[in-house]
Amino acid sequence: VLVPGGFGSRGSEGKIMSAKWARENKIPYLGVCFGFQLATVEFARNVLGLKDANSSELDPDGNNSVIDILPEQEGVKNMGATMRLGDHEVMISGGKAEELYGSSAVYERHRHRYEVNPEYISQIEEKGMNYTGRDESGRRMEILELEDHPYFMASQFHPEFKSRPDKPSPLHLGLVKAALE
């Protein structure tokens, strides 16, 4: 299952259901950007028991915004060029991600306005969703992996932006390999 990047509420509940199905049935899953965010929402709803968990993009008045707007975007009304864009360092600590990349630090391209709400990170990780990739400050979550799952990975960045025919994205290649097993 590949849940790509995107914006807005259209199809979001179906994407959340896809993440749940892949998680529960141990089906290989790769979420990219919005797919990363919605995998976090699904986990918060169904594993943490926060039934109203959501993204503040989808429910601005929600009580459990496990995905929230980037602090530097709060109050910005003009949506032109308001995203976190470009190549940023991702620090990887263990898990499948470090194995796939063969490195503990990589640069990947970003295009997003929302991120994992830091208030929920410890609760999420205590239940088995690990953020094995973080930005250079350690504050922003970049890669998630599920414990005890053959391949459930997601990235806040867009690995497809750097993928080439002769050098595919490690996360996409990992998904294909997991699907073949």
Where are these regions (language model features)?
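Acyltransferase
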Residues: 106-181
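Glycine-rich phosphate/pyrophosphate-binding loop
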Residues: 73-110, 117-119, 125
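Alpha-helical context
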Residues: 19-20, 73, 77, 100, ...
